[in-house]
Amino acid sequence: MKKVKAAIIGSGNIGTDLMYKLKNSKVIELNAMIGIDSESDGLKRAKEAGYEVFDNGIQAIIDNPSLADIVFDATSAKAHSYHAKILEELGKIVIDLTPAAYGPFVCPAIRNNDFLDKQNVNMITCGGQATIPIVHAINEVANVTYAEIVATISSLSAGPGTRANIDEFTITTKRGIEEIGGADKGKAIIILNPAEPPILMRDTIYCEVKDMDEVSIYEAIHKMVERVRTYVPGYSLKQEPMFDGNRVTVFLEVEGAGDYFPPYAGNLDIMTAAALKVGEEFATQIVSEKKRGVMNEAK
């Protein structure tokens, strides 16, 4: 199968981790790594790996539109708001790994292929990718009236982009809890833990439900965990769900694959693994459409 060309904008922690994941993709060929700091570790690693590198940001795509059909934006919410319009005009499929929420939210464990007609999709946040599937699973069987999540990540795994987007993180994750998770009302909190040695990503999900059914909720949570594990193997329950009246509390832990950052950075891993899965679905569709076009021409 001919691979679909892609580029990454943003050579920070998330962009660099994604670079290593794309290396093993069977349907996507990473063509370029784009940043704004020629001395960044991400651009240096990309150059060493043999990828074309640019340090002039979005201008690289403007000057070389044939670089990629799919663009992964791993910059910041503010930067993506500027990039989105340019990439839309250039006809690029955009997978946004910032909390900009310019396009519709996508969580691969919840939505199947109903995003493939969109040009720009948003991967919510790392905390959202970890917790929203659980909120959704509970809501499917018990009607969640309120959901609150606390995402705790190692301070070392939070780069400048993450730190600059704390407000956007809470707002976008809250929206995702409600719009994708299905909760009537949501709330999100992020904690950067400076502990040494660094802790694994940990997430607490607290839900108030209208229709309590412990057995159905328990089964729904476990099924969803297994679904997420198909693309994030380090995703797991820290302990069994806790029930108290109309309240359910779930404790998660996410261990990263160690592609770029050590395994404690599960927050990077769940974001990039989810983006890779979504990108590969877009790439598969592009290849299928091209094949169909060739067959129609042959007729």
Curated annotation (Swiss-Prot):
Gene3D superfamilies: Dihydrodipicolinate Reductase, domain 2, NAD(P)-binding Rossmann-like Domain. It comes from the Bacteria. It catalyses: acetaldehyde + NAD(+) + CoA = acetyl-CoA + NADH + H(+). SUPFAM superfamilies: Glyceraldehyde-3-phosphate dehydrogenase-like, C-terminal domain (SSF55347), NAD(P)-binding Rossmann-fold domains (SSF51735). NAD(+) binds at residues 11-14, 157-165, 267. One of its GO terms (molecular function) is acetaldehyde dehydrogenase (acetylating) activity. One of its GO terms (biological process) is catabolic process. Keywords: Aromatic hydrocarbons catabolism, NAD, Oxidoreductase. Signal peptide: none annotated. InterPro entries: Acetaldehyde_dehydrogenase, Acetylaldehyde_DH_C, NAD(P)-bd_dom_sf, Semialdehyde_DH_NAD-bd. Its EC number is 1.2.1.10. The active site is at residue 126. Belongs to the acetaldehyde dehydrogenase family. This is Acetaldehyde dehydrogenase. It comes from Bacillus cereus (strain ATCC 10987 / NRS 248).
